[in-house]
From Swiss-Prot:
Gene3D superfamilies linked: Hexapeptide repeat proteins, Spore Coat Polysaccharide Biosynthesis Protein SpsA, Chain A
Protein name stated in the entry: Bifunctional protein GlmU
Organism per entry: Buchnera aphidicola subsp. Acyrthosiphon pisum (strain APS) (Acyrthosiphon pisum symbiotic bacterium)
Binding site for Mg(2+): D105, N227
Alphabetized CDD domains for the sequence: GT2_GlmU_N_bac, LbH_GlmU_C
NCBIfam families for the chain: glmU (TIGR01173)
Binding sites annotated in the UniProt record for acetyl-CoA: A380, N386, Y387, S405, A423
Subcellular localization(s) per the UniProt record: Cytoplasm
Subunit relationships: Homotrimer.
Start and end residues of each stretch annotated as Linker: 230-250
Associated pathway: Nucleotide-sugar biosynthesis; UDP-N-acetyl-alpha-D-glucosamine biosynthesis; N-acetyl-alpha-D-glucosamine 1-phosphate from alpha-D-glucosamine 6-phosphate (route II): step 2/2; Nucleotide-sugar biosynthesis; UDP-N-acetyl-alpha-D-glucosamine biosynthesis; UDP-N-acetyl-alpha-D-glucosamine from N-acetyl-alpha-D-glucosamine 1-phosphate: step 1/1; Bacterial outer membrane biogenesis; LPS lipid A biosynthesis
Species classification: Bacteria, Pseudomonadati, Pseudomonadota, Gammaproteobacteria, Enterobacterales
Keyword terms, alphabetized: Acyltransferase, Cell shape, Cell wall biogenesis/degradation, Cytoplasm, Magnesium, Metal-binding, Multifunctional enzyme, Nucleotidyltransferase, Peptidoglycan synthesis, Repeat, Transferase
Cofactor descriptive note: Binds 1 Mg(2+) ion per subunit.
Amino acid sequence: MLTQEIIIVILAAGKGTRMKSNHPKVLHFLGGKTILEHVIETAQSIKPKKIILVYSDQKKPVLSNIYNIPIQWIIQKKPQGTGHAILLAIKKISDNTEILVLYGDVPFISPVSIKKLQKSKKQSKISLLTAKVKNPNGYGRILRKKGKVISIIEDQDASNEQKNIKEIYSGIFIAQSKDLTRWLKKIDKKNEKQEFYATDIIALAHLEGSFIKTIEPLNYEEILGINNKLQLSNLEKIFQKKQINKLLINGVTIKDPSHFIFRGTLQHGQNVEIDTGVILENNVILGDDVKIGPGCIIRNSSIDSNTNIQAYTIIENSKIGKGCIIGPFAHLRSNTLLDRNVHIGNFVETKDTFIKNESKVKHLSYLGNSEIGSKVNIGAGSITCNYDGANKFKTIIGDNVLVGSNTQLIAPIKIAKNTTIAAGTTVTKDVNTPCLVYNTKEQKYKKNWMRSKKIIKKN
């Protein structure tokens, strides 16, 4: 673990114009989290003395209140480069302490590589995270003389000869705040972008006779940055592959890994099976022997053991008990709670509904703002009419109730246990004792009636 005396500065002030979006670049999503969220979580795992985040928008990003450790937000009102952004952060630091600089658009940097970087700092004034790559386009190049780092040249300022250099700079480094302040105050804006480049401090450190150490990350993917939607898409693929490989190694059966999308966190038991085309988002919990059929979307929900989620079912913000059968083509919306051995069938939609043990809603029904007892059977086409155009009301159905097909339950309403409701009934009043509930509907006949005939148009 790194020392707690380190201060982490995250640079997130870039406008991200190449994303061609109204949203800040670092607030685009990668693997179910914002790009910036990945970086902050890594920083948080190191347990630093402080995290300082430099941003450009007048309004703080929505992440400002998420994390337990406080984040100090510093605005860079005008885009004057990374050197200027780091100097703004250091001005808020009173003592001479170790500074780690991370970037808000480099999401895969690992705590292990940061630990290596900090360890190497003990041997130098400044330690850089670098890598040797086949295609260095877009990155600053490491310039060496007799093996020693003497400076960094940005891609847009590099000569043709310098552009052939394969060793690149990630932008991530560690140095003492006192040294950084001295170097940053000496840099200028004589470059293509007319900005203060943080990379210029390397040449200054060299001129002072400082030894500059370089460390490579565990893998090249850790220093990949995001500047456009293509790069975001490529990193999403990398993220998905890593997450899926972890699940496979940990015993989850994924029948078609190339068509499984996982954006968030997954806790799982043994013998979990996931079919093709499944999407899991946010925080998902799958118990032992859970089976997820093809095309399902499960978002921020928990599913207990031995439950079978059949094809093309959507489950959102819900909790499913043991031994349930859901789907196919069911939609369990927010705050659906199912007890044990509940069956939700084809084209059933639920919301804000609690269904107790062994109840069945097998066809073409809607249950909203409802509490359903145990061993209840809801017939096809039954609807809880919970909304009057302004307010929503609750339907409460007791144990062992049989609701016939095509029934409308006009909320607020309560149905006593052991009641039977005949098919086609509209229930408008509470049923307080067990009985048969039905509407009298006279069946009529019209004799000598004939169907209409098609009119044949003449040309």
